[in-house]
Swiss-Prot record:
Cofactor binding note: Binds 2 divalent metal cations per subunit. The ions could be magnesium and/or manganese. Monovalent cation. The ion could be potassium.
InterPro entries per the UniProt record, alphabetical: F420-0_g-glutamyl_ligase, F420-0_gamma-glut_ligase-dom, F420_ligase_CofE_arc
Entry cofactors: Mg(2+); Mn(2+); K(+)
EC number(s) given by UniProt: 6.3.2.31, 6.3.2.34
Native source organism of the sequence: Methanococcus maripaludis (strain C7 / ATCC BAA-1331)
Name recorded for this polypeptide: Coenzyme F420:L-glutamate ligase
Binding annotation for a divalent metal cation 1: D115, D155
Positions bound to a divalent metal cation 2: S156, Q213
Gene3D superfamilies cross-referenced by the UniProt entry: CofE-like, CofE-like domain
């Protein structure tokens, strides 16, 4: 016999293009949708950065000598390389046509997460403080609607031992980020000793399937009826400390 246990809904929403010059906030925009308690709102980081006017015009950037030299190796414009360096704590790996850095947030990713896609002009870094941004959006939504929701800001990142980019949570508020399941029992009564689930990353990846990573134009996703804890989780709790990273 097969029994239906869980049914989760994933709703992709098209919204107006965000420039940062709107006379409404993201919370006000999102609140126009009929939200329900325990909805999880996943927002593409591009939208958040643009709404926060975190876009740098190329003609305002003066590349350093380091950026100019690196640009020749990477095949990127010196201005783009300068922003990559400015957004990083350190360079983790450097090779022909690629640079992997640790960002100021602690993320290890290509190009410090710096992007030019889906931006009509300028260079777009990641949001300055994604957890803070997620929290402000969540609080704004709850004040307007009275609904208890979670917010995740997601981005696409590559994975070191697998091909293809995948959605990850860079900012989290109101929903679990890292789900510690140690002490729970499995189906056969054995106690879980080490299990920690990156549940916010799993939700971010789920949303990315609907968002797409090209010209789909769906930067906002509602995940409804997700069987996950709602608490004061953050994106930071998903970052492995450098001293715990056996590959660096």
């Amino acid at each position: 016999m097969i029994t239906e246990r869980v049914k989760m809904e994933v709703i992709g929403l098209e919204i107006p293009l965000i420039s940062g010059n709107e006379d409404y906030t993201l919370a006000e925009l999102i609140s126009k949708y009929p939200l329900k308690d325990k909805d999880i709102i996943v927002i593409a980081e591009t939208v958040v950065s643009k709404s926060e006017k975190n876009v740098i015009l190329k003609d305002t950037i003066k590349p350093s000598n380091e950026a100019i030299e690196l640009s020749k190796k990477l095949g990127k414009e010196p201005e783009v390389v300068q922003v990559i360096l400015d957004e990083s704590n350190e360079t983790v790996r450097l090779g022909p046509n690629f640079i992997v850095t640790e960002t100021k947030h602690g993320f290890v990713c290509a190009n410090s997460g710096v992007d030019e896609s889906n931006t009509s002009k300028g260079i777009k870094p990641l949001p300055k403080n994604p957890d803070k941004s997620a929290n402000e959006i969540r609080k704004g939504i709850e004040e307007i609607t009275g609904k208890n929701v979670g917010v995740i800001i997601n981005d696409s990142m590559g994975r070191p031992f697998r091909k293809g980019s995948c959605g990850v949570a860079i900012g989290v508020s109101g929903v679990c980020g890292l789900w510690d399941r140690k002490g729970e029992k499995d189906l056969f009564g054995r106690e879980l000793k080490t299990t920690e689930v990156g549940i916010a990353d799993e939700l971010a990846a789920t949303a990315s399937v609907v968002m797409g990573q090209s010209n789909e134009g769906i930067p906002l996703v509602i995940i409804r009826n997700a069987p996950v804890p709602f608490n004061d989780g953050t994106g930071k709790e998903l970052i492995r400390k450098k001293e715990e990273d056996v590959f660096r």
